[in-house]
Amino acid sequence: TIYRSLFSLARQNPHLIRRACAGALGFGVLSMVFTSMTFVLGSAPYYFSDFEIGLFGLLGVIGIYSSSWSGKTVGQGKENLVAKLCIGLMLFSCVPLYFAQHSLIIYAIGVLMSYFGLTAFHVLNQNLVYRIDGKARSRINAVYMTIYFTGAALGSLGAVYAWQHYQWVGCVVLGLIFSLGILMIDRFDFKRMQKN
């Protein structure tokens, strides 16, 4: 059946699972940022309306440019550079995000950093996993995206839990933990790729 073929593909390609897990953690970071955005902007000192929060969320349009940049740079054979820059952006976005309740501009910078990093990283991951087997592209995509969206769900759930128990600091720490996880998986995977 199709499900057996997907499980078989996943078992036979640990590289696919590593890239998918790294991508899932990245999507988890972004999901945490956007889930908690309502909490941050809807409370003191901003008290934004739902409409205003939605407008602020349009910062995500930067993803259009990050996708284009990532695709071109990966096409030049600079996958490792793209990975390092993307992970660096996601890691260091925690610094401006930490000050979200003190400055809207600094918060916006943090959101842009995390969104740019994740979107470009997603393009990189898809580029890498599609090289595994061009004939199995649809099945590879199914495995990758299933794990990828699981990360988003975990990020949203984690953000709600962190906010309820630890407020905004808890959300930022969660994002940092996810980002460190991305770093470890990504570096391990690149070492394995170099050996192979």
Residue ranges and their predicted role:
Residues 1-20:
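Juxtamembrane intracellular "pre-TM" segments in multi-pass secondary transporters
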Residues 22-34, 42, 117-118:
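Conserved extracellular-gate-facing transmembrane-helix segments in secondary transporters
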Residues 24, 58-62, 112, 142-150, ...:
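Transmembrane alpha-helical cores of Major Facilitator Superfamily
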Residues 44-62, 139-143:
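Loop-to-transmembrane helix entry
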Residues 65-79, 163:
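Helix-to-loop junctions at the C-terminal end of transmembrane segments
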Residues 80-125:
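C-terminal transmembrane helical hairpin of 12-TM major facilitator-type secondary transporters
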Residues 130-168, 174-178:
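A late C-terminal transmembrane helix in Major Facilitator Superfamily
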Residues 173-196:
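Multi-pass alpha-helical transporter architecture, strongest
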